[in-house]
C-alpha cells in the first residue's frame, strides 16, 4: 500500500470505529464487522482499487451519520409531539 493511501485507510478506519460507538446493535458487533471488512481487503495493492474502497467507506460514513441523525430526530419528535392515533 502506498504511503498517502495508507494514511487515508487508517483515517477511514478510525472514523468508522468512532462512529460505531452509537451503532444500534452495539459497539462490539460493529467493531467485529468493521475489522472483518478491512481484513478482507488487506491484500489489495492496486491504488485505484484502494481508492474505490476508501470512497465506499466514506459513503458508509455518510450513511451512518444519516442513520444517527434520523434516530435523534425521532427521539426529539417523540419528546415534543403527542403520538397520533
From Swiss-Prot:
Disulfide bonds: none annotated. InterPro entries: Complex1_LYR_dom, Complex1_LYR_ETFRF1_LYRM5, ETFRF1. One of its GO terms (biological process) is negative regulation of oxidative phosphorylation. It comes from Danio rerio. The gene is lyrm5a. GO terms for cellular component: mitochondrion. Pfam families: Complex1_LYR (PF05347). Transmembrane segments: none annotated. PANTHER family: ELECTRON TRANSFER FLAVOPROTEIN REGULATORY FACTOR 1 (PTHR21024:SF0), GROWTH HORMONE-INDUCIBLE SOLUBLE PROTEIN-RELATED (PTHR21024). This is LYR motif-containing protein 5A. CDD domains: Complex1_LYR_ETFRF1_LYRM5. Belongs to the complex I LYR family.
Amino acid at each position: 500500500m502506498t504511503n498517502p493511501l495508507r494514511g487515508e485507510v487508517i483515517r477511514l478506519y478510525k472514523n468508522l470505529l468512532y462512529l460505531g460507538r452509537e451503532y444500534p446493535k452495539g459497539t462490539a458487533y460493529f467493531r467485529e464487522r468493521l475489522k472483518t471488512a478491512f481484513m478482507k481487503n488487506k491484500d489489495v495493492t492496486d491504488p485505484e482499487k484502494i481508492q474505490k474502497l476508501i470512497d465506499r467507506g466514506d459513503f458508509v460514513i455518510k450513511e451512518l451519520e444519516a442513520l444517527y441523525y434520523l434516530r435523534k430526530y425521532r427521539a426529539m419528535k417523540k419528546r415534543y409531539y403527542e403520538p397520533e392515533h
